[in-house]
Curated annotation (Swiss-Prot):
PANTHER family: RIBOSOME MATURATION FACTOR RIMM (PTHR33692:SF1). An accessory protein needed during the final step in the assembly of 30S ribosomal subunit, possibly for assembly of the head region. Essential for efficient processing of 16S rRNA. May be needed both before and after RbfA during the maturation of 16S rRNA. It has affinity for free ribosomal 30S subunits but not for 70S ribosomes. GO terms for molecular function: ribosome binding. The PRC barrel domain binds ribosomal protein uS19. This is Ribosome maturation factor RimM. It comes from Thermus thermophilus (strain ATCC BAA-163 / DSM 7039 / HB27). GO terms for biological process: ribosomal small subunit biogenesis; rRNA processing. It is found in: Cytoplasm.
Amino acid sequence: MRLVEIGRFGAPYALKGGLRFRGEPVVLHLERVYVEGHGWRAIEDLYRVGEELVVHLAGVTDRTLAEALVGLRVYAEVADLPPLEEGRYYYFALIGLPVYVEGRQVGEVVDILDAGAQDVLIIRGVGERLRDRAERLVPLQAPYVRVEEGGIHVDPIPGLFD
């Protein structure tokens, strides 16, 4: 079993145990989630309130119980995730991929930062010098960044990987 983080619980919603969910919309397709420190919980209800998702979990029946879960990480089992359409990827699948600029490996994806308007790849460089091994931030934006078989290809960005 392999778990991947899909989000965190935000503030409670109303009085009957609802929690705002901050994270991947993939939660809409799940029947259960793994809650940090609390184990597996069935999703009993899930709905939108404006732009937010609200989740009701089995055993979380009032606001006091919901408050105990605020800020906790929420995970899903990889096998429970729905398949994605061609050209789309789960972010966890990008972690560890090599990054190439003009056919030369310049680093490896170590994390992905949710920066609001667009997500950002955190790439740890490869090389002999300390500067070569520094982390660099690259917006995850097509057509400048392409996920292809064998790695991620980034168009040259002057000064970033020189």
